[in-house]
């Protein structure tokens, strides 16, 4: 099948078919020699290559690649497929998943992982394959003329799983951005809070227009009357005539002192 070049695809085209669409519109048409909706899936025997060599075998795909591939028998008289590749092998993982179209079972999906080396001591890699085959493909897979061909075609979706370290770095980068944003909010909120406190403090420092005598006595910058020890500076206000009137005169002097302070404080 001739593969369409990426340059001829419509702008913004993305190939993200569902499992059902891959079976019904692509794999079924391929096995029946009918044209597919878009000719972007090449015919490649994927077992003749290692998975990292496959992206260069197609002109379409960035993070995942699709191929129509035949499957060979592992043993001449068996029905098990040969999963060996150039420098390793594909190993099935999990159970097969049935693909339905409406109420009909139209295909099967199998997940496989690529291992480097020979079984059973192969080294697991991050390369993954989803293999799609028709539901009735096993019934049609009869040996013909000594051929080792098991299936005429299966559809393979191959991709490389994102490494755990890369994913962790991306998550850490995201968390750093979140923390930086939170710290910025804290600084702004703290600045706003301090501004409000300063405004409140400045407002509270304004002297009231009217004050009671008790309030004046409690103000820090004036202090209680008991702190005023030297009354000599106010001697000109009143001079007592005798010792008998000294206490009463002292009270009079204190009242005048308070009036004097009150007038001085409210000159602003």
UniProtKB/Swiss-Prot annotation:
Phenotype of the disrupted gene, per the record: No visible phenotype, but delayed leaf senescence. No visible phenotype under normal growth conditions, but mutant leaves show a stay-green phenotype and deficiency in chlorophyll degradation during extended darkness.
Localization of this protein: Nucleus
One of the GO BP terms on file: multidimensional cell growth
Stretches assigned to the NAC domain: 9-161
InterPro entries in alphabetical order: NAC-dom, NAC_dom_sf
Function: Transcription activator that binds to, and transactivates the promoter of the abscisic aldehyde oxidase AAO3. Promotes chlorophyll degradation in leaves by enhancing transcription of AAO3, which leads to increased levels of the senescence-inducing hormone abscisic acid (ABA). Involved in the control of dehydration in senescing leaves. Binds to the DNA sequence 5'-CACGTAAGT-3' of SAG113 promoter. SAG113 acts as a negative regulator of ABA signaling for stomatal closure in leaves, and controls water loss during leaf senescence. Transcription factor of the NAC family involved in senescence.
Protein name, entry field: NAC transcription factor 29
Gene symbol of the encoding locus: NAC029
């Amino acid at each position: 099948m001739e593969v369409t070049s990426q340059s001829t695809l419509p702008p913004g085209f993305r190939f993200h078919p569902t499992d059902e669409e891959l079976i019904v519109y692509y794999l079924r048409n391929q096995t029946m020699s009918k044209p597919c909706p878009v000719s972007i899936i090449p015919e490649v025997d994927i077992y003749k290559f290692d998975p990292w060599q496959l992206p260069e075998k197609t002109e379409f795909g960035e993070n995942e690649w699709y191929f129509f591939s035949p499957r060979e028998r592992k043993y001449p008289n068996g029905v098990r497929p040969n999963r060996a590749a150039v420098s390793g092998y594909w190993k099935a993982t999990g159970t097969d998943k049935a693909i339905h179209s409406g109420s009909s079972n139209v295909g099967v999906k199998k997940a496989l992982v690529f291992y480097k080396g020979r079984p059973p001591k192969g080294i697991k890699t991050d390369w993954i394959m989803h293999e799609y085959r028709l539901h009735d493909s096993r019934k049609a897979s009869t040996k013909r003329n000594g051929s080792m061909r098991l299936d005429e075609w299966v559809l393979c979706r191959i991709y490389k799983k994102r490494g755990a370290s890369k994913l962790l770095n991306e998550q850490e980068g995201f968390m750093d951005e979140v923390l930086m944003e939170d710290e910025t909010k804290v600084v702004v909120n703290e600045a706003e809070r301090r501004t409000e406190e300063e405004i409140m403090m400045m407002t509270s420092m304004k002297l009231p227009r009217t004050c009671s005598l008790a309030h004046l006595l409690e103000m820090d910058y004036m202090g209680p009357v008991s702190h005023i020890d030297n009354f000599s500076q106010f001697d000109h206000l009143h001079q007592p005539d005798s010792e008998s009137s000294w206490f009463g005169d002292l009270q009079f002097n204190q009242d005048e002192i308070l009036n004097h302070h009150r007038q001085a404080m409210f000159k602003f």
